[in-house]
């Protein structure tokens, strides 16, 4: 028992779904394993009227991240005395439902030129390594005596993307054609490191107001175009060449990009300027 207690005390970050010896546990609450799931329904139909082709559909996703939300965000449930959390002040988060319409349109303007347009909304879960944390790790974050660069998130929303495309196909020879497409993509609700402004000094559970959390609040935009040259198969030879240019911009390239600014509190405001993201690949 003494060895177990000592091991438990030395393992300050704790774990989810396993005990201190690495054995799987099947229990409820913060110490139990998480079982996220996604349920999806997609309906699509195509309508043709002469040379005009319309493709319309809708996708419905129901995301269950199997995570938690705070009953009172202004008073996070830190149990300072027992070095843990008040689990009765944390409840299961709700399933998030996202409806995503999709629409495509194509029509010819001459015998050689065809225009096409597309619009769609897309949704996905945040990265699952961001929201989850054990009660021991929550204790470290809320106590404020340790710098925790990878804290936890509560009740995160799905990340949403809206995408537009417009382009044309031009058959300039009987066996050769070019495709030119311009696209724009806007992603919102991306996860970023932040604080809860609701938590004030002197809150009920004495939680450090500068405690960090993952929240939805960042965005990125991607604009660009794609040029494709293609030929039909002639004497068992077919040519296909494509070039894509894209420009990805946003405030933070990573959920933890804001960590340095937050660690300086009010001395260093969070980044607000839109910049090229470090993973952008223009060509």
Predicted segments with their positions:
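Transmembrane beta-strands of outer-membrane beta-barrel proteins
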Residues: 1, 54-58, 115-117, 166, ...
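Signature of Gram-negative outer-membrane beta-barrel scaffolds
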Residues: 1-112, 126, 130, 144-146, ...
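Flexible, surface-exposed loop regions and adjacent strand-edge segments
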Residues: 2-15, 70-81, 85-86, 131-140, ...
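Transmembrane beta-barrel architecture of outer-membrane proteins
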Residues: 36-42, 98-101, 151, 161-165, ...
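Outer-membrane beta-barrel channels and translocator barrels
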Residues: 49-52, 108-110, 161, 173, ...
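Membrane-embedded beta-barrel scaffold of Gram-negative outer-membrane proteins
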Residues: 114-116, 120, 126, 130, ...
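Gram-negative outer-membrane beta-barrel transporters
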Residues: 183-186, 198, 204-283
């Amino acid at each position: 028992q003494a060895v177990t207690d000592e091991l438990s005390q030395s393992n300050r970050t704790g774990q989810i779904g396993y005990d201190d010896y690495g054995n799987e546990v099947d229990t409820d609450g913060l110490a139990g394993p998480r079982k996220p799931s996604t349920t999806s329904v997609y309906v699509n139909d195509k309508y043709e009227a002469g040379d005009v082709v319309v493709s319309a559909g809708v996708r419905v996703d129901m995301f269950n991240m199997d995570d938690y939300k705070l009953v009172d965000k202004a008073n996070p449930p830190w149990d300072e005395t027992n070095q843990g959390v008040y689990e009765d002040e944390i409840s299961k988060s709700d399933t998030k439902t996202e409806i995503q319409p999709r629409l495509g349109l194509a029509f010819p303007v001459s015998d050689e030129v065809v225009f096409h347009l597309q619009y769609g909304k897309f949704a996905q879960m945040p990265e699952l390594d961001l929201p989850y944390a054990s009660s021991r790790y929550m204790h470290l974050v809320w106590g404020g005596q340790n710098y925790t660069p990878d804290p936890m998130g509560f009740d995160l929303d799905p990340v949403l993307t809206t995408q537009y495309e417009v382009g044309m196909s031009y058959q300039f020879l009987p066996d050769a054609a070019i495709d030119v497409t311009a696209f724009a993509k806007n992603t919102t609700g991306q996860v970023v490191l932040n604080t809860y402004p609701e938590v004030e000094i002197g809150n009920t559970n004495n939680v450090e107001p500068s405690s960090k959390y993952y929240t939805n609040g960042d965005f990125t935009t991607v604009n660009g175009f794609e040029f494709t040259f293609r030929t039909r198969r002639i004497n068992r030879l077919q040519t296909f060449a494509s070039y894509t240019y894209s420009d990805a911009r946003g405030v933070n390239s990573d959920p933890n990009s804001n960590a340095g600014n937050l660690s300086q509190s009010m001395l260093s405001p969070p980044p607000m300027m839109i910049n090229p993201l470090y993973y952008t690949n223009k060509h």
